[in-house]
Regions:
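Amphipathic alpha-helical interface segments
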Residues: 1-171, 191-241
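Carbohydrate-active enzymes and regulators
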Residues: 184
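Long, charged low-complexity segments
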Residues: 174-181
């Protein structure tokens, strides 16, 4: 309600000022309802879109696990490196995909925020150097006779993914314990850090990760095909015979 005195002053203003005031008031009142409606629409749309991606990821994950188990008893070391790299990546992408819809559209603000934090944590902790250091990857390329063109494609994919990784580290540099592990002794600071997490910045990081992920998904199967050719398998086998 507008106090009577303020209402009188408002009505004394020029008509454009009055119109603007009522427009702002209407936006403030309707905004929560508009946002809620948009989230419902977005949730339905994303759930439909992500269903196909989720099924594809699950299938790829199951196949990769099955093949890697077979390879672990073989002497094809380069193929092991590439399949292990694939599994490492697929697990991270599956985690992000599992919370993506909730991060963007869950009706509960806290659950949206929690999903955002999980996405950031996955990208923050995701470190390709752990599973495939540059020297190990280079050796695998050489042993499997991977073409220079495919090596460059992989390098570009890694560059984009590492860029997202760096951004995630920046966003969580001073707030990781509060936003994820709840280790900060200052509970109010912890609460403010969690609730003030920038959703748009988080989604930009995720978008950057997916940009690299798309390149990676295109390049890695081609690398694995080359590594699985007769010529490559014979070369790998002879190195460890």
């Amino acid at each position: 309600m507008v106090p009577r005195k303020q209402k009188r002053k408002l009505l004394e203003q020029p008509q454009p000022v009055i119109n603007r005031w009522f427009a702002i008031k209407a936006i403030r009142i309707s905004r929560p309802y508009v946002e809620s409606t948009l989230r419902v629409y977005l949730r339905a749309k994303l759930t439909y879109q992500e269903r196909k991606r989720s099924a594809a990821l699950t299938s790829a994950l199951d196949t990769t696990i099955k093949e890697l188990k077979k390879l672990n008893a073989s002497k094809f070391e380069s193929l092991k490196v590439f399949f292990n790299l694939s599994l490492f990546f697929l697990i991270a992408e599956k985690d992000i995909q599992a919370v993506k819809v909730d991060a963007l559209s869950h009706p509960d603000a806290w659950k949206r925020n929690l999903s955002l934090r999980i996405m950031l944590l996955v990208i923050h902790e995701w470190d390709m150097a752990k599973v495939a250091p540059a020297n190990k990857l280079r050796e695998a390329y050489e042993a499997a006779s991977i073409s220079q063109e495919l090596r460059e494609e992989m390098t570009e994919a890694f560059r984009k993914i590492n860029k997202a990784h760096s951004k995630a580290k920046q966003l969580l540099a001073h707030a990781r314990h509060a936003t994820i592990a709840h280790r900060d002794a200052d509970a109010m600071l912890q609460y403010e850090t969690i609730t003030n997490l920038d959703a748009m910045e988080t989604m930009k990081v995720a978008a950057s990760f997916y940009e690299g992920a798309d390149l990676f998904i295109q390049a890695l199967p081609k690398v694995m095909l080359e590594a699985g050719s007769i010529h490559s398998l014979l070369k790998q086998y002879s190195r460890h015979a």
